[in-house]
Amino acid sequence: RSIDVHAAGAVCWKVVDGEVRVLLVHRTQHKDVSLPKGKVDPGETLTETAQREILEETGLHIVLGVPLGKSDYRLPSGKSKRVHYWSAEVDPGEAERSSFEPNGEIAGLEWLNIKRAIKAVTYEHDGDILRTFETLFNNNRLNTFPVIVVRHGKALPTEKWDGPDWSRPLAHRGLVQAQDIAGGLAAFG
Protein backbone atom coordinates (compact mmCIF):
# COMPACT_ATOMS: atom_id res chain seq x y z
CA ARG A 1 0.00 0.00 0.00
CA SER A 2 1.27 3.48 -0.70
CA ILE A 3 2.03 6.04 1.99
CA ASP A 4 0.78 9.61 1.49
CA VAL A 5 2.95 11.39 4.08
CA HIS A 6 6.50 10.43 5.08
CA ALA A 7 8.05 11.77 8.28
CA ALA A 8 10.94 11.14 10.64
CA GLY A 9 11.83 11.81 14.25
CA ALA A 10 13.82 10.59 17.22
CA VAL A 11 13.65 9.49 20.81
CA CYS A 12 16.05 12.04 22.28
CA TRP A 13 17.48 10.74 25.54
CA LYS A 14 19.97 11.47 28.29
CA VAL A 15 20.89 9.96 31.64
CA VAL A 16 20.18 12.14 34.69
CA ASP A 17 21.27 10.91 38.13
CA GLY A 18 21.54 7.35 36.81
CA GLU A 19 18.07 7.36 35.23
CA VAL A 20 17.30 7.60 31.53
CA ARG A 21 15.06 10.50 30.50
CA VAL A 22 13.40 10.95 27.12
CA LEU A 23 12.22 14.17 25.53
CA LEU A 24 8.57 14.82 24.71
CA VAL A 25 7.12 17.85 22.95
CA HIS A 26 3.85 19.57 23.78
CA ARG A 27 2.44 20.56 20.40
CA THR A 28 0.42 23.76 20.32
CA GLN A 29 -1.79 23.25 17.26
CA HIS A 30 -2.57 19.58 17.90
CA LYS A 31 -2.92 20.01 21.67
CA ASP A 32 -1.03 16.77 22.24
CA VAL A 33 2.15 15.32 23.71
CA SER A 34 4.37 13.37 21.35
CA LEU A 35 7.85 12.48 20.23
CA PRO A 36 9.55 15.18 18.14
CA LYS A 37 9.13 14.50 14.44
CA GLY A 38 8.13 16.10 11.16
CA LYS A 39 7.44 15.71 7.48
CA VAL A 40 10.10 15.08 4.86
CA ASP A 41 10.92 18.13 2.75
CA PRO A 42 11.40 17.65 -1.02
CA GLY A 43 14.83 16.20 -1.80
CA GLU A 44 15.53 15.31 1.83
CA THR A 45 16.42 11.87 3.20
CA LEU A 46 14.63 10.46 6.25
CA THR A 47 17.76 10.88 8.37
CA GLU A 48 18.12 14.52 7.30
CA THR A 49 14.46 15.07 8.17
CA ALA A 50 14.86 13.58 11.64
CA GLN A 51 17.89 15.73 12.39
CA ARG A 52 16.32 18.93 11.00
CA GLU A 53 12.99 18.42 12.76
CA ILE A 54 14.63 17.79 16.14
CA LEU A 55 16.60 21.01 15.74
CA GLU A 56 13.53 22.99 14.64
CA GLU A 57 11.24 21.63 17.37
CA THR A 58 13.68 21.43 20.29
CA GLY A 59 16.75 23.51 19.48
CA LEU A 60 18.92 20.39 19.93
CA HIS A 61 21.72 19.37 17.56
CA ILE A 62 21.62 15.58 17.54
CA VAL A 63 23.40 12.61 16.00
CA LEU A 64 21.18 9.67 15.11
CA GLY A 65 21.75 6.29 16.71
CA VAL A 66 19.93 2.98 16.52
CA PRO A 67 16.80 2.84 14.35
CA LEU A 68 13.70 2.26 16.48
CA GLY A 69 11.21 1.32 13.80
CA LYS A 70 8.29 3.09 12.24
CA SER A 71 4.72 4.07 13.01
CA ASP A 72 1.95 3.88 10.43
CA TYR A 73 -1.34 5.64 11.04
CA ARG A 74 -4.14 7.61 9.43
CA LEU A 75 -4.38 11.37 9.70
CA PRO A 76 -7.75 13.06 10.34
CA SER A 77 -7.77 13.88 6.60
CA GLY A 78 -7.75 10.14 5.83
CA LYS A 79 -4.21 10.22 4.41
CA SER A 80 -1.76 7.55 5.54
CA LYS A 81 1.38 8.63 7.40
CA ARG A 82 4.58 6.74 8.16
CA VAL A 83 7.07 8.07 10.70
CA HIS A 84 10.57 6.55 11.00
CA TYR A 85 12.34 6.91 14.36
CA TRP A 86 15.92 6.70 15.61
CA SER A 87 17.42 6.97 19.08
CA ALA A 88 19.48 10.10 19.71
CA GLU A 89 21.52 10.43 22.87
CA VAL A 90 21.72 14.08 23.87
CA ASP A 91 24.93 15.38 25.35
CA PRO A 92 24.18 17.09 28.69
CA GLY A 93 25.92 20.26 27.50
CA GLU A 94 23.82 20.27 24.34
CA ALA A 95 20.63 20.02 26.37
CA GLU A 96 21.71 23.08 28.38
CA ARG A 97 22.60 25.02 25.21
CA SER A 98 19.27 24.31 23.51
CA SER A 99 17.87 27.43 21.86
CA PHE A 100 14.27 26.29 22.37
CA GLU A 101 11.63 28.96 22.95
CA PRO A 102 7.89 28.19 23.09
CA ASN A 103 6.36 28.99 19.70
CA GLY A 104 3.32 28.45 17.51
CA GLU A 105 4.24 24.82 16.87
CA ILE A 106 5.74 23.63 20.17
CA ALA A 107 4.45 24.97 23.49
CA GLY A 108 7.01 23.18 25.64
CA LEU A 109 9.53 20.39 26.13
CA GLU A 110 9.55 17.82 28.90
CA TRP A 111 12.23 15.31 29.95
CA LEU A 112 10.57 12.30 31.60
CA ASN A 113 11.62 8.83 32.67
CA ILE A 114 10.42 6.16 30.25
CA LYS A 115 7.47 4.90 32.31
CA ARG A 116 6.09 8.43 32.77
CA ALA A 117 6.74 9.25 29.10
CA ILE A 118 4.78 6.20 27.92
CA LYS A 119 1.83 7.34 30.05
CA ALA A 120 2.18 10.98 28.95
CA VAL A 121 2.14 10.56 25.16
CA THR A 122 -1.21 11.12 23.51
CA TYR A 123 -0.87 8.41 20.86
CA GLU A 124 -0.36 4.68 21.37
CA HIS A 125 2.05 4.50 18.42
CA ASP A 126 4.42 6.87 20.28
CA GLY A 127 4.16 4.55 23.30
CA ASP A 128 5.12 1.61 21.07
CA ILE A 129 8.27 3.41 19.91
CA LEU A 130 9.13 4.30 23.52
CA ARG A 131 8.69 0.64 24.57
CA THR A 132 11.06 -0.42 21.77
CA PHE A 133 13.54 2.19 22.99
CA GLU A 134 13.16 0.96 26.58
CA THR A 135 13.87 -2.65 25.57
CA LEU A 136 16.99 -1.64 23.65
CA PHE A 137 18.19 0.59 26.51
CA ASN A 138 17.61 -2.10 29.14
CA ASN A 139 19.53 -4.63 27.01
CA ASN A 140 22.44 -2.19 26.48
CA ARG A 141 21.75 -2.08 22.73
CA LEU A 142 22.00 1.71 22.30
CA ASN A 143 25.73 2.01 22.94
CA THR A 144 26.69 1.56 19.30
CA PHE A 145 28.46 3.32 16.47
CA PRO A 146 27.42 3.43 12.82
CA VAL A 147 28.96 1.25 10.15
CA ILE A 148 27.63 2.48 6.84
CA VAL A 149 28.52 0.65 3.66
CA VAL A 150 27.94 2.58 0.46
CA ARG A 151 28.75 1.47 -3.06
CA HIS A 152 30.52 4.18 -5.01
CA GLY A 153 28.54 6.36 -7.39
CA LYS A 154 28.59 6.07 -11.17
CA ALA A 155 32.22 6.10 -12.36
CA LEU A 156 33.72 6.84 -15.77
CA PRO A 157 33.40 3.85 -18.11
CA THR A 158 36.44 1.54 -17.94
CA GLU A 159 37.12 2.05 -21.64
CA LYS A 160 37.59 5.78 -20.98
CA TRP A 161 40.11 5.29 -18.15
CA ASP A 162 43.69 4.07 -18.50
CA GLY A 163 44.65 3.86 -14.82
CA PRO A 164 43.92 1.18 -12.24
CA ASP A 165 40.23 0.56 -11.58
CA TRP A 166 40.44 1.67 -7.93
CA SER A 167 41.49 5.15 -9.12
CA ARG A 168 38.75 5.54 -11.73
CA PRO A 169 37.04 8.91 -11.06
CA LEU A 170 33.34 9.47 -10.69
CA ALA A 171 31.30 10.56 -13.68
CA HIS A 172 29.13 13.68 -13.35
CA ARG A 173 26.20 11.48 -12.29
CA GLY A 174 28.40 9.85 -9.63
CA LEU A 175 29.39 13.26 -8.25
CA VAL A 176 25.70 14.20 -7.99
CA GLN A 177 24.99 10.88 -6.25
CA ALA A 178 27.80 11.54 -3.77
CA GLN A 179 26.45 15.01 -3.00
CA ASP A 180 22.91 13.66 -2.61
CA ILE A 181 23.91 11.06 -0.04
CA ALA A 182 26.20 13.28 2.06
CA GLY A 183 23.47 14.87 4.21
CA GLY A 184 21.81 11.59 5.03
CA LEU A 185 25.10 10.05 6.12
CA ALA A 186 26.10 13.15 8.14
CA ALA A 187 23.06 12.63 10.39
CA PHE A 188 24.92 9.67 11.92
CA GLY A 189 27.89 11.85 12.91
Model-predicted regions and their roles:
Residues 18-61, 159-176:
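Conserved Nudix-box catalytic region and its N-terminal flanking loop in Nudix hydrolases
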Residues 52, 88, 132, 180-184:
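Residue-level signal for well-ordered alpha-helical scaffold segments within enzymatic catalytic domains
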Residues 31-32, 95-157, 161:
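Nudix hydrolase/Nudix homology domain
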Residues 144-189:
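Active-site-proximal alpha-helix that buttresses catalytic centers in soluble enzyme cores
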Residues 3-5, 17, 78-81, 104, ...:
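A generic fold-level signal
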Residues 1-35, 146-153:
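N-terminal strand-loop-strand
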Residues 40-126:
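Unchanged
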